[in-house]
Amino acid sequence: MAKKAVSEAKQTGAAVQGKRIGIHLSTTGGVWKAVEYAREIGANTLQIFSASPRTWRAASVKPADAEKLKQARLQLDVGPLVVHVSYLVNVCSQSDETRQKSITAFRGEVERALALGAEYLVLHPGSYRGMTREQGLVLAAESIEKAIDGLPWQDADFHILIENTAGAEFSLGGSFEQVAELIERLRKHAPVGVCLDTCHTHVAGYDIVTEAGYAETMKQVGQTIGFDTVCVWHCNDAKAARGSKLDRHEHIGEGMIGAEAFRRLLHDQRFAHAAFIAETPVDEPGDDARNVALLRTLFAG
């Protein structure tokens, strides 16, 4: 099944147009190689890490690599480019040491994203364990403001996207209201938007599976975050049940959310401007191509 998906994706990759559908890819061999591979599997947008997501230190982007990436994107029409922040960053940590390391690391993330010409940088707000949610919100906003202070983001087509979380205890961003509050605090100080994750939304307790549930959930999105603020959807099926708070991604159509929910989302004109990017497992060769191909099929059908 995976081999068939790769073959079909490669046949159609050069002709991909319109809807921005992609996947998170490795940058092994060079970030521009990820762009080339994205096209091979039928994607016209992608997400990457700009450095190892499990280390605090990272090298700066080499100008030659940034230029190769720029040319590859222009030639292959791949965009937007989304960079995901390291998992270590916690901008609302109660620990002064962790928070300061997070501010420094996040500043590096912004610098690398700008150097790469990325349109979006996705950030998990973090954990406010040991504090109130309000204190966590204040710290998160202050930390982000400190991290970007003095950086030339005003001259770029660039936004920091706050991602909703799975709703685990002390996790900031588990509800649309929390995401909206953080965005509102940041609007005057940073270029911000939102990334919504289907798996996180589902396990946090929102219904996106049934038609009526989807309508109610999107009503809440409109009333809190606003549709235009959602720049990216992370398209991930879920291994766990709605409301479980367990962030376990599954292949599109093989989890508790199901293919029909993704078809409904991809056809929702309120998100016609957004990019749709999978962060699905790679259990065997060809899984990336298979998930991209299924999302394209659901959009076409």
Please place each PLM-identified region on the residue numbering:
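Active-site beta-loop-alpha junctions enriched in small/polar residues
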Residues: 24-28, 51-53, 86-88, 126-128, ...
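Residue-level preference for long, well-ordered alpha-helices that form the structural scaffold
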Residues: 58, 62-65, 95-98, 102, ...
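Histidine-acidic metal/acid-base catalytic patches
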Residues: 2-5, 10, 180-301
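Aromatic/hydrophobic pocket-lining residues that form the small-molecule binding cavity
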Residues: 31, 66, 102, 106, ...
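Conserved, mostly hydrophobic/aromatic
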Residues: 38, 84, 102, 113, ...
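Acidic (Asp/Glu)-rich catalytic clusters
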Residues: 12-16, 36-43, 61-82, 109-117, ...
